[in-house]
Amino acid sequence: MFLDIDACLENREPYYKMIENIAAECFMPLCYGGGVKNVEQMKKIYALGVEKIAISSQAVINRNLIKEAASLFGNQSVIVTIGIKKDVWGKKKVYINNGKKNAKLNLIDFIKEVEFLGAGEIVINSCDNDRVMKGYDIDLL
């Protein structure tokens, strides 16, 4: 899985040439995520040799994107990445925009919804453990 987390932060298109170069050298199924906001971008990325696309913030903002992508490309090609942070009381909350904005969603309900909409895989990411070298959030799992 190749995630360009800066694409979301910088509100820019994916770097298609970079994706093409990585896909050309990758001899295993490749998943790309970062800055993907619509099916037109997905079509370009799949055409470059990527097998799966991960969406995160857009899965919250535009849930229809999950359904549309699954319908066009197949459930196996759509991955939803869910960012999780604990609040001051230790409750797990869904966050978007690289862990900067609380989406105000119930985690379990959202997981069920994205599965129903057609996500073939769901990746849970503990934003609290990003870049701190503490390993997996076992309690979250």
Where are these predicted regions, by residue range?
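Glycine-rich, proline-tolerant flexible connector loops at the mouths of alpha/beta enzymes
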Residues: 1-18, 57, 123-135
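Intrinsic disorder and flexible coil segments
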Residues: 5, 18-21, 29, 58, ...
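Alpha-helix-loop-beta-strand connector modules within alpha/beta enzyme cores
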Residues: 10-31, 67-83, 134-141
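Short secondary-structure boundary/capping elements
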Residues: 10-14, 34-37, 61, 102-106, ...
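Generic internal hydrophobic packing segments that stabilize the cores of diverse globular domains
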Residues: 16-19, 23, 39-47, 63-66
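Catalytic cores of alpha/beta
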Residues: 26-53, 139-141
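Conserved anion-binding
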Residues: 46, 50-124, 128-129
